[in-house]
Amino acid sequence: MVDALNLGKILRVHATVYVAAEPVPLFWPMRTFIYNNPLHGLEGLPFTEAVQAARGLFHARVYLPRTTYQHYLREGKGDVRMLDAITAQFAQTAPSIDGIDWQRWLSAVRKAPTDASPYVPHASAEDVAAVLAGQAIPNGSAIAAGLDAAMLADLPPWRPLTECIDSLWGTNLAAELDELVVKSCLDFFDEDQSSWRMPGRKQGFYAAWADVARRNGRMFLRGLAIKRILDQAPRADAAIVHVMQSLGIAEEHWQAYFSRELLRLHGWAGFIRWRSGAEHYHWGRKHPADLVDFLAVRLVFALALIEESARHRKTPANRPAFDAFLREQRDCALLRYALHAGELLPGWAQRIDDALERSSGNRIARLAEDYAKEWRRVHAQRQGQILQKIAMEAGTPVQTLAALGAQGAAEVLEVLQRFAVQEGSMWLRALEARAIDHLLSQIVTPDEPAVPKRAFAQALFCIDVRSERLRRNLENVGDFLTFGIAGFFGVPVGFLGYGKGSETHLCPAIVTPKNLVLEISAAIDFDEEDFVSTLGHVLHDLKSSVISPFVTVEAIGALFGFDLIGKTMAPLAYHRWRSRLDAPHPFTHLLLDKLSREQADSIVRALQRAMIVNALRIELGIERERVNDDMIRELRETALGHCSGTTILVREFGLSLEREARFIEQVREVYRVNSSYANYQMLRLGRIGFSLDEQVNYVWTALTSIGLTRNFSRFVLLIGHGSHSENNPYESALDCGACGGSNGLVSARVLAQMANKAEVRAKLRTIGVDIPADTWFVPGLHTTTTDTVELYNLDFLPPRLLVYLERLRNGLYAASRLSAAERVPTLLPQAKTLKPAQAHRIVRVMSHDWSQVRPEWGLSGNLYFVVGRRGLTQKANLHGRSFLQSYDWQLDPKGRLLENILAGPVVVGQWINMEHYFSTVDNTHFGSGSKVYHNVAGRFGVMTGNLSDLRTGLPAQTVMRHGQPYHEPLRLIVMIEAPLDFARRAIEAVAKVKSLVQGQWVRTIILDPTQDMQAYVFDDGEWQVHFISASQSTYTEEVVTA
């Protein structure tokens, strides 16, 4: 048995796993989809370095293929002058070689009608020089060249041993390992989807899995020695040490080894990594697990598979044995690598297979020598042909190539290797340069009338790109003034909805709310028992039943059949009919004010009494009607230690003193009627609501941050947004990211309720924000799949405003239909000529059609993030591609509001942008593939087919159309309207944003209103004065056309 680990070793293992997991992107449950940069763990590096690291870690593409960029360039979406300038800058770093014009050579590579790299890895410069000179490949140690180097580079000591064995013996150990781990994860992490659940999950992942694995007969029959391994390592950290020592992996390689193991299933690892840090996640508290558990399970399985393979196939049982095989049987290893892992040359498979099966060492050596020579020749010829094509396109004489020699060929290959790495970033910068010019060309200096006219209504929308169309159309159809603000309206809340038993965080994922808001029926009186019961959910982990127990299985089946037919054949009409069957949601209001200590104490007392009643019934069989309030009070006081002596249980019910004492102890420990838990409950209840000062601060901050501090309209609309679609696991990805993947209605209701309070307005008046008595804040919801806006809490609307309500609704309705008419052609290219009414009906039908894989494009197409006054872009059509954050630097003398905008909305916007970028450039590795093959896993994620890694990122239907990118993967272009030095100080003050700007994860523009709107762009490590390219007029917006 492994010796008990000392504390230092335990901490070292945990720390190593923690660091190894940094490249693993976090994965939130699908029901609250959170956009996230897949390379978040690499954001400390500059963008270009991070994507190169990710290419190796995720085995993924990080830029689009060259031919796609060429297509964009032909459509006018790239700045040719910028591309030529970047190419020329790179050419200056190349060594001078007689006869080679590097600018023309690299331009020829750029224009080649192929996605192939100009550089062939492992092609020898000496061999390439011979090919170009028309000579034979030189003799020499063929074994020591090319193929040998490729094999050793592919099998480093930190690569998982299962993969290494697969590479030489053609086994399937790594895939088998993935399958076993996924099955174990499904069993443990299931959230009431499966009919069978792993027992003992409260112990934690590794302990529960180990208990099951010890008794798993199928593994025993297969010959997997799981039990023997577990006997050596009862704890997860001990198991990791035992396996790594058994495999002979040197400790200096553990971190890299762990990273590779975790990234094999980065979806599951990312979910567990998020889950272990989510303190309020119900399932995480109930069934704990962390990446040490996950890695331990994986490594134990890996060791068992490796040992089984060693027994049956005579493969190495550890890394030292594997390395010995590479050294002592290099010829055999080379042939095995060529057959199972390398790029096998045509016509060699049967010869190598026969030799490995039946031949002696001498024949294997000769075959390896012959194959290596042929491998060298093929790679050299391939590289030579590429160079000849480039030379022909660049106008370089053939004689120049023939005269290169080995040294010259090495210099050429080194330049092409560097260019192959950097070419993608060159294309990216050229496209971004054109996009920057396109944005700046539409900017106008906002008009500031001396006496501002009072608009009919002001509307605060989420900064989400899908709000841009609706805002623009609303301003065009009527006297509306719109603003952009983060969709949680600056108020982070935990929310407990009516009839719900768990809390939802309505704020960005990087924020943890301190305050809790309850939704309660308007009919409930504060002193009633129902109200106390509602608050009880705050203190207990309760879950609602998914299907009512009063409905029979047959009835469910019949209703499901109706659903299937209705949602497919007539989705809109069926939705209207079906909604009549659902119980109506009662009229509710939000509990926003803090509870007094007396109110909180009465709630705790009521809950304690309820728990004692339950204890009497469950533990002693004494029903409620047999006890009165005085008896319950006596038991409560005894349990809390406020009184001593015998209780009614002895006097009235004849219990022995021993049984009475045991019952009181059960009430204290099991039912938690004790002083310490009462204090905890009081702290929990203290989270409910906001103090008056908090409410004033949140309203002041929200209004000031967007520049709305005077000239209020009668209506101030607070429009959150959400989505509606059928049969869509990714529905929450279409909701509000600023609200933690939920819709924004509750956040709108919270701020509206605060802003409408007379006490709040009175205090706001003292700090410079005077909201007129005839102004009313109205919450609403923009459903992005249908482009509709519905207003809420109109029952509270003052009677004097009712006369204007129809005008308000008509304006919103007209804007909705115009927005639908813009959006439908992006979904259905054949529907370009639809009238607004027709388009509006089509999007409503699509949102209720459960066969629809793309009810909307969501945030696909996002490109810009504008921080400034609405007047900058009010006359521009940004085609639903821009986040629009209202901001007036003149109301922010210290820059604190700008810092908050940068630290919050801009960072979230960058997450959204990067999620779309990487899901587009490689949907297989960074995205989640096609929805068609998705199955829900455990109610928190999706898999491809029945068993796979959890699919992270966005599905193909969100970012691709007909196999080509719909979303144009460019970095987020952030434009800030503020004086240059003022904006720079704000950026410097927020460390995360400073890193993103300097690392070029976002492209940043400062638009200085004190210098006649002069633009400064951060590039090459400095702020540069920017002038719009003369060729800007050729830019087109393909995203909104077929």
Swiss-Prot record:
For the ligand (Zn(2+)), the binding residues are: 462, 464, 721, 736
GO terms of molecular function:
zinc ion binding
State where the protein is found.
Cell inner membrane
Which keywords accompany this UniProt record? Cell inner membrane, Cell membrane, Membrane, Metal-binding, Transport, Zinc
What cofactor does this chain's UniProt record say it requires?
A: Zn(2+)
Q: Which GO terms describe its cellular component?
A: plasma membrane
Q: InterPro entries attached here?
A: DabA
Keyword set includes Membrane: yes
Question: What membrane topology does this protein have?
Answer: Peripheral membrane protein
UniProt similarity note: Belongs to the inorganic carbon transporter (TC 9.A.2) DabA family.
Purpose of the protein: Part of an energy-coupled inorganic carbon pump.
Q: How does it assemble?
A: Forms a complex with DabB.
The UniProt entry, under PANTHER family, shows: INORGANIC CARBON TRANSPORTER SUBUNIT DABA-RELATED, UPF0753 PROTEIN AQ_863
Protein name as catalogued: Probable inorganic carbon transporter subunit DabA
This chain's source organism reads: Nitrosomonas eutropha (strain DSM 101675 / C91 / Nm57)
Q: What is the lineage of its organism?
A: Bacteria, Pseudomonadati, Pseudomonadota, Betaproteobacteria, Nitrosomonadales
Protein encoded by which gene: dabA
